[in-house]
């Protein structure tokens, strides 16, 4: 009986695909807020893109010339990094074209406007044609096909990057939560209510722990998951499917 329960749960979560003999209708008509998506951070970017991840988070720092660089490890040592421009080129080459949107989360670990302006410059000279403006939460997954959705925080304000950002976790429509906050919220009902209409992104803690999925990161409706959970797989899954 227990194996059947496990299989049923995995199928409901979208982790088991029907056999080739069945015709599966993928509902792409619902708003973005109604889809779960697994993401990747601090993983080799090209590897993550080749796996098909449509949510990538990059941690951006300033180098000695105030150019934007992306940390390759959680506890950045000022050594292991790559240029932000090279990341943009890889995203351009590997993430598009696609039937799915691509969500790029940028965490700026600098208050230097020059660096943020250079981030905007590299985005504009690589993936600009895939970017969009305006609200995205209520748009259907299908209408966002092949688009780049940019999310970031307060550090983008007052820079050339700000008008490129679709969602900020410092505004009321997006929340940035740690794994602990998402799975053990202080106000569970309030979080469930929030995620019915808005988006929550779940990120690893500072120790970048490896999770065994003992707790359901999606339990209170949090849609975007950057925690390296074993059951995580690329793509968008309708949360009521």
Question: Could you say what each language-model-derived stretch is?
Answer:
Residues 1-55, 62-241:
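Long, acidic (Asp/Glu-rich), low-complexity accessory segments flanking structured domains
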